[in-house]
Amino acid sequence: MHEQYQPRDIEVAAQQKWEKTAAFKAVEDASRPKYYCLSMFPYPSGKLHMGHVRNYTIGDVLSRYMALKGYNVLQPMGWDAFGMPAENAALKNQVAPAAWTYSNIEYMKTQLKSLGFAIDWEREVTTCKPDYYRWEQWLFTRLFEKGVIYRKNGVVNWDPVDQTVLANEQVIDGRGWRSGALVEKREIPMYYFGITQYADELLADLDTLDWPPQVATMQRNWIGKSFGADVRFAYDEASIGSAGELTVYTTRPDTLMGATYVAVAAEHPLATQAAANDPALQAFIAKCKAGSVAEADMATMEKEGMPTGLFVVHPLTGAKLPVWVANYVLMSYGSGAVMAVPAHDERDFAFANKYALPIQQVIALKEGDATFDASTWQDWYATKDDSTRLVNSGKYDGLDFQGAFDAIVADLAAKAAGEKKTQYRLRDWGISRQRYWGCPIPIIHCDSCGDVPVPADQLPVVLPENVVPDGSGNPLAKMPEFYETTCPCCGKPARRETDTMDTFVESSWYFARYASPDCATGMVDDRARYWLNVDQYIGGIEHAILHLLYARFFNKLMRDEGLLANDEPFQRLLTQGMVVCETFYRDLDNGSKEWITPADVVIERDGKGKIIAATHKADGLPVVVGGIEKMSKSKNNGVDPQALIEQYGADTARLFMMFAAPPSQSLEWSDAGVEGAYRFLKRLYKIVSEYVAGGVAERFVAGELTADEKALRLKLHTTIQKVSDDFGVRQQFNTAIAAVMELLNLFDRTEASRAVRQEVLESVVVLLSPIVPHICETLWSALKPGSELLAQRWPEVDPAALVQDEIELVVQVNGKLRGSVRVAADAGRDVIEAAALAHEQVRKFMDGQPAKKVIVVPGRLVNIVV
């Protein structure tokens, strides 16, 4: 054993050993309980960032812990390799996305290996490889034939200069992010997954999962099951010119008597009709169509509208209600129309006040003296519970929410003007992307036969990999060698679909492919029934809705195809917090900011650790402290994991990541914290090194012990208890590390036999090995020559060690801590009082005064009141 801790040598040796012995190869074994631990796989962007390191270290700690507990562990890794960043990089660097992607994968794989993760690399999957995506193409054809996937027109953002479709986030102030051209809304044919067919099951099964409550709530809200009614407003034939009806869905039919107008989307047929001879309305509709349809933007944008001059008829009162075109109504939601009750909906209230539309109160509170003011919104206006009653509603006056709901819906049904309806906020998933770097959609368009799925024996439809996009549309649509084909049904010339799939499709089933990644006959084989579902899934909360919902949906699709036996993909979910760091910048003359990496800044702090001055290393001049934010390229506040590993070693990086904060909370980067982690590992190495220099021993099993030895063993076994609970139940690794540090502090100051010291050190090495596996490999080899750390079992708590002959009690004087005393575990009150009153520090703070009262809390403390 080397005298000094040398992380580089230790880590290389351990990693080579693990690779040579295939230490983490997962093999199905029906005789052992399995544990499938999965961290969300990375996009191969080029380099790992600290968020990756934190995510994968958490998964590795849990995987190694469960292996020590005797479980058959699977921890795989792969690459979410399709997507826009590769196309953007290809444009910038004039290189094929495939070459850029594969190069990044090789580098990032080296980085992951240097961190010592217990990954079974034989199960690696790469989603841009045909042997992966051929099976999602196969599933696509099956679902298309069953009607779960269908084709219909959808609205997209079209860049007329680049001749391409843009994602919502690529539209900036109504213009294309690259060309700067005004973006148009276009209707084009797209493919959709019928996820709404599974809405009820997706909602109900959330109750079976061990997920953070906030994630389950986010999914429930996204699915958005609501109970309401369809209400049909007959066309006013005098203004519209024909018979017909406008159907709207509302969750508040109880407020129908307060409806004063209806609003339709810019694409609605009534809007189109009204605009035919109205240039101002045409311009407004064009403006609406050019605007963002992203929900976040819709929620914050100013609500605008224009009257159409058309009217519909209120189904209960016969009143004529004006039809408005409004920018907050989307054609893709429901019927593209809403009824407006300004008095009891905050958005409608603001709109009605802006355009001087009628506001009719129909709800009042049963108790209190709250009055309705049509100029000022109050939260109680939107109340729907037993505390309200209807007013100004004719025969419905006095009814509460549920009574009014039922009565009004019954009357609508009697008039054939409406009925109860359960609706979902969730919409079917449009997966067509007019992009190159994605999985080709396996459909052939034939003039005679229509849309024909590619037969299974012609799959995969391989994406050409030697293409360098030029930014002007989808390259596949310009490649006759790709799209020219023959119809599988009639043999006539036909055209292959050139759209590719949303990259969320690949990440929706990768968890299942890991179970049998080499299966050449299907998406999965019988090995999936052994490994699935995933016992522990780890990733950022930013994926709480889309990725996690789509993966749950895919699991059910695969189950219904007979491929999987389980209903849900991920039994337990851990959402780790962000890695954050200080930001620094200087204001430039052009109004922008120059962000300066923290490594180039000299910081001065006050006694409480607050930054009071910051200067640039290069010129010594001040820089502005921008605050703590998520590590990012845009703020230049990232720390390169590779530099950290090279300076301190992977174990230091892992230890800091696990010690600095609980997994679910944000982790604030701290150079001092990294130094502290490194110092602890040096100290651990030194303790074991000095002990081993005196010769190793057999660990303590049974025998006579001194009081100090008993105290040390008590601390050891309570630490084992705590670390086991922190790892296996609470998943709070920072407190587990703190407990081991406390144990080592006691170890350092306790005289004990070599057998007891051996027991403590062996246990410490095993307890820490999931977090810092490299150093623990070396320390174990020194403590137990000839045995393998990975073959060990997690330490068991010795009940005998928890039985105390003596206990330590805290002693307070007037409620303030002044010392502690050790007494026999069965000591009586008199003995405890005498010991406390005889304590030197206690006598000092009593200052000769007699004790008015002595309070003894058994097993915990003594409080002397003077």
Curated annotation (Swiss-Prot):
State its location(s). Answer: Cytoplasm
- EC assignment: the record states 6.1.1.4
Q: Which Pfam families match?
A: Anticodon_1, tRNA-synt_1, tRNA-synt_1_2
Q: Which residues form the signal peptide?
A: none
Instruction: Write down the chemical reaction(s) this protein catalyses.
Output: tRNA(Leu) + L-leucine + ATP = L-leucyl-tRNA(Leu) + AMP + diphosphate
Its GO biological process annotations read: leucyl-tRNA aminoacylation
One GO term describing the cellular component: cytosol
Q: Which domain of life is it from?
A: Bacteria
**What would you give as a GO molecular function for this chain, any one?**
aminoacyl-tRNA deacylase activity
Q: Does the keyword Signal apply?
A: no
The UniProt annotation places ATP binding at: 633
What is the predominant subcellular site recorded for this chain?
cytoplasm
Write out the transmembrane intervals: none
Give the enzyme class: ligase
InterPro entries listed in its UniProt record: aa-tRNA-synth_I_CS, aa-tRNA-synth_Ia, Leu-tRNA-ligase, Leu_tRNA-synth_edit, M/V/L/I-tRNA-synth_anticd-bd, Rossmann-like_a/b/a_fold, tRNAsynth_Ia_anticodon-bd, Val/Leu/Ile-tRNA-synth_edit
Disulphide-bridged cysteine pairs: none
Tagged with keyword Nucleotide-binding: yes
Record family assignment: Belongs to the class-I aminoacyl-tRNA synthetase family.
Checking NCBIfam families in the record gives: leuS_bact
Report the protein name in the record: Leucine--tRNA ligase
User: Which organism does this record belong to?
Assistant: Laribacter hongkongensis (strain HLHK9)
